[in-house]
């Protein structure tokens, strides 16, 4: 009886014959089960089976009636892994957002430049008053700056008299640089003006060596050679060449690079309220006051409807194109400083080189400027030299070992 009771309680119940389970033995089996040794009933193997099931992420874990001791730790590990994966995904999306934002800024920079050069050229060709056009551009920029400061769209700076005195030379050369550029655009094609302006690195190297004592590296000197050679080749073969336009563009290079040298020489002290955009805004306001008396004394008042009509030009078109050109002039310089705050100076220089290529190509297409193969080759060499200069100017010479 004892052996049969133990046998009937074993896990192999399906092997029993149905005829042996009768009502004659209803109680003896359960009474013997209470004294069975633990090694007879096969319960211990079950936790090992439930351990293997609990180690997976499948829904079969709920099928086990015995909780696993390691389950909470495994859940915690999975929670930590998921928690650390979320910031990485957020960082990736954040980087992608910054890249898209930077790409949008570069596109705006190039687009504003294209529109400025096209509309500015049309106004200068019709009006023949570069000083008046330059004054209008400074005036529109000053109105925008005042509007931003009045509405607190940009923080209004607190400038001391000493800082204004230090900024004044920068405003003078900034005014002259834009005036000479407009004088050149009024005399020669847009593509030729920007080809000549590709010689800015040459003036930068010469002025930095003269006033700052910066000796150029052989790499920099090597990059200047194709710039000078390309501009010379393009100038010889330029259809619209005249000395007034050529010398005006050269003077623009000289004044613009003098501004960069002066900014290093004067060392304007900057605080939190005087960043690049604020400095540009102050220079624009000062340029307006510098340009106004010179314009009225030299050209008089030529932006009136009566004068424009006497020149045989549509008044509304001149006003509209002048306004668009002035807005684009101020916008592309603001965007340029925004890009400079996000990238390295080398990247900004490369972007500026690409911008010049885009402006030259777009102006040639829009104005249908005749370009000979030799002229295009010279322009290409000059721009390639500018690109090379932007890459090698940051290379520092190796220190001499004793």
From Swiss-Prot:
Membrane topology, Lumenal segments: 120-131, 231-278, 395-402
Q: Where is the transit peptide?
A: 1-82
UniProt entry keywords in alphabetical sequence: Chloroplast, Membrane, Plastid, Transit peptide, Transmembrane, Transmembrane helix, Transport
Q: What is this protein called?
A: Triose phosphate/phosphate translocator, non-green plastid, chloroplastic
Write out the GO cellular component annotations.
Answer: chloroplast membrane
Q: Which residues lie on this side of the membrane: Chloroplast intermembrane?
A: 83-98, 153-209, 299-374
Family stated for the protein in its record: Belongs to the TPT transporter family. TPT (TC 2.A.7.9) subfamily.
PANTHER family attached to this UniProt entry: SOLUTE CARRIER FAMILY 35
